[in-house]
Amino acid sequence: TNALSYIYFDEKGLLKKKGTLRVFQDDEIRKLVPLIIQAFSVATPAQVVAVSSYSERMLLTDQQNYCIMFISDRSLNIAFSRIHMLQTYNDTMSEKKKYTKTKENPTRISHSRFWKLIPSAGQRLEPTHENWLVVDLSNEIYQQPVVQRVGTIDEKIKVLQDLRARFKLI
């Protein structure tokens, strides 16, 4: 869980947001971690675990992350091909059809025009790759209990909407 919590990126381009952003939000991590653990428990050392996550956003769009993970020399390797890529409903449906035909391989990509991973403590980029993190799982930061983070803007908006709905009922 800590490994996913400490993955950050900077956006590139004219429409970039300010500052460094987290790749995975807390709600995504809570959903993904049990599935990733289960996948690694049945994978052979030569297999990779493919991870695709969607964070729901307003106006019928989702943000997609896609990466593959594998363990080599006590390090978790995570290679991304998509980070916070906006998807409409139609895009999502066509993606599902595409994945039944072909699988993309993020290790064959060296960078993205839209983002760059920013290594945290105990992490480094694979040489010549801006999209591939190597996480040293023996680093003490990944041995610590998970710290609850402040919610995302979307999570805060949802809490406010829930509170307003409760007050209307009273």
Feature locations, PLM:
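Polybasic, proline/glycine-rich intrinsically disordered low-complexity segments
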Residues: I83-K158
